Structure formats: structure tokens, C-alpha cells
């Protein structure tokens, strides 16, 4: 499986929603989540991609310990949580650190413990509940092959934009 570069914006356990300004590279506090939820894993984006929402593809990285905003990690996709929000399609690729022996047994979304998948799905289903005009629709899980196709499409989308 191919390894990809991602940048973490939000560490596991945070309510702060950080975003990287892609022109300056600076990390900004976008908002504090309106709900009492915390991110269930480190959250960021795939470099050099463009998702359906016009932003780089989102990624949730399962790690032993959280990292801090701005850290780059080589990951391999193992699945995808298919969802949409008020801006359109908003798939969340689920990945693990490439070559970390603690995660080698996770090759596909079904290798992730069921309870962990439920936590991730519950977080994304409810984390915007108190924000006016925002919503999320969960559409289900996809396997590693589907996640890989979405990542490849993200690279192609950015290239088609002339970048």
C-alpha cells in the first residue's frame, strides 16, 4: 500500500478546530467546537489534493499518542467514512502511520475495532449539532480500496485545477 504525506491540524482530544492557511503555512484557530465533543483521533489533510468540498482531502490518523498542529506524517489509508455536510461531499479518510509496527495489523477498515469506528462515526454525526445552519449526513463506511481511489481522485482534482 502506498504511503502519503498528511499534515495534522488538530490533535486527538482537542475541541479546538485549527486550520492551516495553505498560502502562508500558518496554523490558525478557526473555532472551538460548539458541542462538548473532542476529536477522536488526530485530524488533518492530504497534501496536494483537492476534495469535493474544494479543500484538501480530510484524514483521521489513528496514532498511539497525539501530535501537535503542523506535524507531517506518512500514512496509509485503511478506510473511509463517507459523509456530506452543508458544503457537499466531505469524506473522511481513515489512516494509520506507515511502517509503525503497532498498526501493521490494521490493513482495512474492518480491522479497526468496532467500538473505535462507532466513536468516529458518532463524533462526525454530532459535532456540528449546535452550529446554526450546519449539518452532517453519514453515508457509511468504505474499505481501503475505496479510500485509495478517493485519495487518487484528490490528486487528480488538484492537477486538473492546474496545480
Curated annotation (Swiss-Prot):
Active site residues according to the UniProt entry: 90
UniProt protein name: Inorganic pyrophosphatase
Domain of life: Bacteria
Reactions performed catalytically: diphosphate + H2O = 2 phosphate + H(+)
Binding site for Mg(2+) 3: 85, 90
Residues noted as binding substrate in the record, renumbered to the chain: 17, 31, 43, 127
Key words of the record: Cytoplasm, Hydrolase, Magnesium, Metal-binding
PANTHER family with a match to the protein in the record: INORGANIC PYROPHOSPHATASE (PTHR10286)
Binding site for Mg(2+) 1: 53, 58, 90
Gene symbol of the encoding locus: ppa
Amino acid at each position: 500500500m502506498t504511503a502519503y504525506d498528511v499534515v495534522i491540524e488538530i490533535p486527538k482530544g482537542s475541541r479546538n478546530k485549527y486550520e492551516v492557511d495553505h498560502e502562508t503555512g500558518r496554523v490558525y484557530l478557526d473555532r472551538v467546537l460548539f458541542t462538548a465533543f473532542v476529536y477522536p483521533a488526530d485530524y488533518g489533510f492530504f497534501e496536494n489534493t483537492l476534495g469535493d468540498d474544494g479543500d484538501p482531502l480530510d484524514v483521521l490518523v489513528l496514532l498511539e499518542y497525539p501530535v501537535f498542529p503542523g506535524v507531517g506524517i506518512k500514512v496509509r489509508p485503511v478506510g473511509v467514512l463517507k459523509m456530506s455536510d452543508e458544503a457537499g461531499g466531505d469524506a473522511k479518510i481513515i489512516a494509520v502511520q506507515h511502517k509503525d509496527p503497532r498498526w501493521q495489523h490494521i490493513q482495512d477498515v474492518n480491522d479497526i475495532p468496532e467500538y473505535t469506528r462507532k466513536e468516529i462515526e458518532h463524533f462526525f454525526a454530532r459535532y456540528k449539532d449546535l452550529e446554526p445552519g450546519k449539518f452532517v449526513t453519514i453515508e457509511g463506511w468504505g474499505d481501503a480500496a475505496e479510500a485509495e481511489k478517493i485519495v487518487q481522485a484528490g490528486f487528480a482534482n488538484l492537477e486538473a485545477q492546474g496545480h
